[in-house]
Amino acid sequence: MATKFPSFNQGLAQDPTTRRIWYGIATAHDFESHDGMTEEQLYQKLFATHFGHLAIIGLWVAGNLFHIAWQGNFEQWVTDPLHIRPIAHAIWDPHFGQGITDALTQAGATSPVNIAYSGLYHWWYTIGMRTNAQLFQGAIFLNILVCWLLFAGWLHLQPKFRPSLAWFKNAEAQLNHHLAVLFGFSSIAWTGHLVHVAIPESRGQHVGWDNWLSVLPHPQGLAPFFSLNWGAYAQNPDSLDAVFGTSQGAGTAIFTFLGGLHPQSESLWLTDIAHHHLAIGVMFIIAGHMYRNTFGIGHTLKEITEAHNTDNPNDPHTTAKDGRHFGVNHNGIFETVNNSLHFQLGLALASLGAACSLVAQHMGALPSYAFIARDYTTQSALYTHHQYIAMFLMVGAFSHGAIFFVRDYDPELNKGNVLARVLETKEALISHLSWVTMLLGFHTLGIYVHNDVVVAFGNPEKQILVEPVFAQAIQAFSGKVMYGINALLANANSSATLAANSMPGNHYWMDMINRQDALTNFLPIGPADFLVHHAIALGLHTTALILIKGALDARGSKLIPDKKDFGYAFPCDGPGRGGTCDSSAWDATYLAMFWALNTIAWITFYWHWKHLAIWQGNVAQFNESGTYLMGWFRDYLWLNSSQLINGYNPFGVNALSPWAWMFLFGHLIWATGFMFLISWRGYWQELIETLVWAHQRTPIANLVGWRDKPVALSIVQARLVGLTHFTVGNFVTFGAFVIASTSGKFG
């Protein structure tokens, strides 16, 4: 007889109800909970999944390359990137009538197509690709790589090729490998591509497989490198009248420090980018030789952490007022981190989340791809995309931090160290965060509501408008002169300015920072920015409060002292202990996700509206309407959704109709979430039992039976399903809104 799902949990496989299916899906990737799982097997399985993960990414990128080469207009687009709209792929749908077929036959295509808002065209163009054949070759190469990755994943699960537990826990070797090989060498390799292929192509010099060994990337070749005359590589950069992709204004420099933007492509100088990657690569290769491994030289992480202990009896930090000795503040930290995958994953997710949010900001403030800064819809889509991903990663960091406290934390090993002290002082941490959120919330909302009232009563001059003087000062210190704050780089005679002016060569940072359009990397800010900044701060601090409380209370609280024994996720256990709903560490993640979505919406609303106003030459709209809530609702949300609610109507359709339909459907998905979030298990169990009764008494329905007794989702599962609908609906609705409202104005 076939083994029932899930094979990894025989106890669950014997469950006679539909709970078997849902719990099986929920725990499929919780390898720690599987039958017969050892620590070594756990590490080996996770290692193998990395290859699968990389294979999925490779397939995804190959799919983009293949479909754009097959159905896109890449070769036409590169001839005029500013005016030809890039095509993502063709679309065919049996529901299409003549109206929508005509509306979506766009961008020079002969049949319905989707416009690309991914920025892939700009990326491939910038790195030197020019033909569909190159895109096809890239797709084929990646598919071959995917096959190798899948084979490698399978191979590393075979007994002879499974790495040992000691190999996984050799932190120093792992750090050296990741720093020097993965980060360092890949950065150097990317520098090589930029220098040998991308920079020559940007100067009208084709470099391909046919001539890459015979075309020198610099007239002097490697001579300046070996003679230590490295400055030669920075001499003769492209001129300010350089035309991207042609020899007009082209120089010979390959590593520069120009700053600012290429005037025609309005992107960072490729030679600056190459210099950046070279420096990053060298730094990481040095960093990858710092930790003790094969040769017995270098640091060990255990020594580094324990060197931070304050054992000196004269150290004021050593002894607390009550006489307790605090000198062992890092004892056990290395073992704790090195033996906890959840701790390591939490650190990785937090780091990657912060980096992803930084990418969102920098793709707009410091655009690195040629002409992408003028593709406003793509810029809006990429900002939104990266901020939403950053939100997920950062919430996940706290979630795995909480799982660490439940599953991996050892009180004896960590006695008296910083981890133990964080747990001891959690009430102070949580209550301070609570105080901060209340201060931010009451003050920010109070000012917004005050402004709404006075505007509604016809006295807009009575609004409370606070200039963000400290933020303006930071912009001025960095060189922005419009505020009249004469300090540092905004003062022509300051030591900072004189030092900057003494650097050899030309530099264009000040030109960029004082531009009058959206391409200045510091946009002018005023009272509307001040208010929304504090609204976002409220959202960030509230999200952090819920997540930090969830993690610090994950082992136990005054309400549930033995909470760790219940695991990471557990349902309410009724009124017996004063009601325990919303107290598991998983519930903290669940609750925080709503605040995280709230916050990320405010962040992307702010970025999008401010940029729309600048792009349309109507900066006053944001500055004047952004100081009260009705201004946001009326002049951003309502005004910009007009394109969406007119994508299709009784008089016909236009190219925005698919986004209009997605906008509507996104609202439906979002609203469906509340069905799971508001009505709980008992209602559904009673309904299911009634439906089963009706089914069994309907002769034709009895042709279909089931092995598992139908039961309602658990409270935790229903919350997950509800949150998923809420989140996906949020994405679909706002994604459609951003793309349609921006492309409806700018194409």
Curated annotation (Swiss-Prot):
* UniProt cofactor note: PSI electron transfer chain: 5 divinyl chlorophyll a, 1 divinyl chlorophyll a', 2 phylloquinones and 3 4Fe-4S clusters. PSI core antenna: 90 divinyl chlorophyll a, 22 carotenoids, 3 phospholipids and 1 galactolipid. P700 is a divinyl chlorophyll a/divinyl chlorophyll a' dimer, A0 is one or more divinyl chlorophyll a, A1 is one or both phylloquinones and FX is a shared 4Fe-4S iron-sulfur center.
Task: Indicate where this protein resides in the cell.
Answer: Cellular thylakoid membrane
Sites binding divinyl chlorophyll a B3 sit at: M675, Y683
Give binding positions for divinyl chlorophyll a B1.
H667
Q: Where are the transmembrane segments?
A: 46-69, 135-158, 175-199, 273-291, 341-364, 380-406, 428-450, 530-548, 588-609, 656-678, 720-740
> This protein's superkingdom?
Bacteria
Question: In this record, what's one Pfam family?
Answer: PsaA_PsaB
This protein's GO cellular component annotations are: photosystem I; plasma membrane-derived thylakoid membrane
**Could you tell me the membrane topology recorded for this protein?**
Multi-pass membrane protein
Enzyme's top EC category = oxidoreductase
Chain positions recorded as phylloquinone binding sites: W684
What are the binding positions for [4Fe-4S] cluster in this chain? C572, C581
Q: What is the annotated quaternary arrangement, including any partners? A: The PsaA/B heterodimer binds the P700 divinyl chlorophyll special pair and subsequent electron acceptors. PSI consists of a core antenna complex that captures photons, and an electron transfer chain that converts photonic excitation into a charge separation. The cyanobacterial PSI reaction center is composed of one copy each of PsaA,B,C,D,E,F,I,J,K,L,M and X, and forms trimeric complexes.
NCBIfam families this protein is in? Answer: psaB
Membership in a protein family: Belongs to the PsaA/PsaB family.
Protein name per UniProt = Photosystem I P700 chlorophyll a apoprotein A2
Species lineage: Bacteria, Bacillati, Cyanobacteriota, Cyanophyceae, Synechococcales
